[in-house]
């Protein structure tokens, strides 16, 4: 806050016109005439929003000190935005000005407040003595840190039995690493995770030096994989009945429900000011909840799900924590919100969505370790249900029991892949939200024709698209010594590469590629004048699952197909190859290769 204190003979003001943020005032506030006043011209600033109570207290203490020093008869608080270029929201400004007025009055000071948000004419006569013109910068104290609450209890849950982590005999290194990480026992190696090197080497993505840290540029191969993953989630959720929507990426923090929900997330938000204080979304919750609050729902509609792929979501992660595809400031998040009539219905839907999250691990060929988090009250009442859902995982899970509810959820299940360095990559999640229905005014009409607030499930079936790719690349690094690194066939940018041995084989090879493309196979042609050995090495570097070499014998008979996954060389006809690829990619989305078919025509990104 900035204040300018003028000890005046008189102050006269008259309101002229309202601005768009003017407060409503009675007739007697339209003008004012004050004598022997300490006039406090005041600008409430953005930083005051962090702790308005503190800035009110500090400002009042300073005003009373000057008031007593100059022996004024009264105080006039005059809103004056021109003292600062970094203003708070209008709502906060009015709250602070009213708070100052109330605090001064409680100290026995005769105080008046000039209306906020009006264009005004005013005249003032400054007394001109040494203390008659003073300026002050008032800083709020940092918000008091709440006393550390009781710590969570941790267990390993398997087949209905709970065991303290220290007493559990780990047979799964990934689960052991997850437990150590959650309990703060996993030491940092300081190494860069291998996916950062791989995303560059494979021409998928890279850091963009001209952007804010944590924002990536995507090359054609990487963009293709992202799009296929987005298509996959769309197919998955719509097959379960979800309805796709699209909502804005920027929200007004003057909306109290949005502001309170944002505060639950903490400080890691992109905020900006342009007359209003705005926030870039970190998930699709805000837009989804506003759609639902404007919709007419009855118990017959429930459960009802809406889905959005947020491209992009924004989180202002600390610069030192941003790394590769694992932790970004701008990312792509699939977000599913399901409105449930009551807690019983939400438990049924939760179990279904857990199965959907497990399916993504199977389809992506990624191993998930699982954490079930619940409040103590919820776990006590629904212990049997928690154990039943955990049993669906088919292996031990980490169980966190929170002593009380700190967030909007009472229970959630988090799925995490484990990277090469033994650290979790947070992927799918399902959460039971018991706050947002009421906060955002979402209601449905129940069977008794009463309007009630629903329970809402939050679910991201895969987690952020970037973290999915991160998990896939980290998996290849982990398995490098066991088998050739590769992506699932349906995500491989090039599924088949055709290598003509000599120029006389080029036309046949080109026709073969055309037939593969016509059959919805992503195929390309290495038409460069390189040795066959180099072409084979290049295909291996590109992790191409099937490599077809075309020589004289292949032109006369069956194809020689090199299978990357097994290292086999198989003889098969073109139709057999196409059918094999169709069988391996059945049910998965398909997009064409967004690159020139001939390698000689490609840009080297």
UniProtKB/Swiss-Prot annotation:
One of its GO terms (biological process) is threonyl-tRNA aminoacylation. Disulfide bonds: none annotated. Binds 1 zinc ion per subunit. Keywords: Aminoacyl-tRNA synthetase, ATP-binding, Cytoplasm, Ligase, Metal-binding, Nucleotide-binding, Protein biosynthesis, RNA-binding, tRNA-binding, Zinc. Residues 194-488 are annotated as: Catalytic. One of its GO terms (cellular component) is cytoplasm. It is found in: Cytoplasm. SUPFAM superfamilies: Class II aaRS ABD-related, Class II aaRS and biotin synthetases. Its EC number is 6.1.1.3. HAMAP family: Thr_tRNA_synth. Homodimer. NCBIfam families: PRK03991.1, thrS. The N-terminal domain is an archaea-specific tRNA-editing domain that hydrolyzes incorrectly charged L-seryl-tRNA(Thr). Catalysis of tRNA editing is performed by the charged tRNA itself. This is Threonine--tRNA ligase. The gene is thrS.
């Amino acid at each position: 806050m900035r204040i300018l204190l003028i000890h005046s003979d008189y102050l006269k003001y008259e309101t002229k016109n309202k601005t768009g943020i003017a407060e409503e005032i009675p007739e007697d506030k339209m003008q004012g005439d004050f004598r022997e006043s300490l006039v406090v011209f005041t600008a409430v600033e953005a930083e005051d929003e962090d702790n308005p109570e503190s800035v009110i207290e500090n400002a009042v203490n300073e005003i009373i000190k000057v008031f007593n020093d100059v022996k004024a008869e009264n105080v006039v608080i005059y809103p004056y935005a021109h003292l600062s270029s970094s203003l708070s929201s209008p709502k906060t400004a009015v709250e602070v000005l009213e708070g100052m007025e109330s605090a001064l009055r409680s100290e026995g000071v005769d105080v008046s407040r000039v209306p906020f948000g009006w264009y005004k004419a005013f005249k003032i006569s400054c007394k001109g003595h040494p203390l008659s013109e003073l300026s002050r910068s008032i800083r709020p104290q940092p918000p008091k840190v709440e006393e550390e609450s009781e710590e969570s209890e941790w267990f390993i849950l398997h087949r209905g039995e709970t065991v303290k982590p220290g007493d559990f005999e780990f047979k799964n290194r990934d689960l052991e690493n997850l437990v150590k990480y959650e309990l703060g026992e996993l030491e940092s190696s300081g190494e860069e995770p291998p996916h950062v090197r791989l995303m560059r080497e494979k021409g998928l993505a890279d850091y963009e030096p001209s952007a804010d840290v944590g924002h990536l540029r995507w090359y054609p191969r990487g963009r293709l994989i992202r799009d296929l993953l987005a298509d996959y989630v769309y197919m998955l959720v719509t097959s379960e009945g979800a309805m796709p929507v699209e909502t804005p990426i920027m929200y007004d923090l003057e909306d109290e429900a949005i502001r309170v929900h944002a505060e639950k997330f903490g400080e890691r938000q992109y905020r900006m000011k342009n007359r209003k204080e705005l926030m870039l979304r970190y998930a699709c919750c805000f837009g989804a909840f506003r759609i639902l609050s404007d919709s007419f729902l009855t118990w017959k509609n429930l459960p009802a799900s809406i889905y959005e792929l947020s491209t992009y979501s924004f989180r202002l992660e600390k610069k030192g924590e941003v790394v590769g595809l694992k932790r970004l400031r701008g990312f792509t998040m699939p977000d599913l919100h399901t409105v449930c009539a009551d807690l019983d219905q939400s438990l049924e839907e939760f179990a279904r969505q857990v199965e959907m999250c497990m399916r993504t691990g199977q389809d992506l060929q990624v191993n998930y370790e699982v954490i079930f988090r619940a409040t103590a009250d919820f776990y006590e009442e629904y212990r049997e249900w928690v154990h039943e859902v955990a049993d669906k995982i088919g292996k031990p899970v980490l169980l966190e029991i929170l002593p009380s509810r700190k967030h909007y959820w009472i229970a959630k299940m988090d799925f995490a892949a484990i990277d090469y360095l033994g650290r979790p990559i947070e992927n799918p999640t399902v959460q039971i939200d018991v706050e947002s229905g009421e906060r955002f005014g979402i209601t449905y009409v129940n069977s008794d024709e009463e309007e009630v607030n629903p329970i809402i499930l939050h679910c991201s079936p895969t987690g952020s698209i970037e973290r999915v790719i991160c998990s896939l690349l980290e998996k290849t690094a982990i398995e490098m010594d066991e088998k050739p690194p590769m992506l699932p066939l349906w995500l491989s940018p090039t599924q088949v590469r055709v290598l003509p041995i000599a120029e006389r084989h080029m036309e046949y090879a080109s026709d073969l590629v055309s037939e593969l493309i016509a059959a919805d196979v992503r195929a390309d042609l290495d038409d460069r004048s390189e040795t066959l050995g180099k072409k084979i090495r290049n295909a291996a570097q590109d992790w191409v699952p099937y490599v077809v070499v075309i020589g004289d014998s292949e032109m006369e008979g069956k194809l020689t197909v090199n299978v990357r996954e097994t290292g086999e060389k198989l003889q098969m006809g073109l139709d057999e190859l196409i059918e094999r690829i169709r069988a391996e990619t059945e049910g998965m989305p398909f997009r064409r290769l967004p690159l020139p078919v001939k390698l000689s025509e490609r840009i080297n990104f």
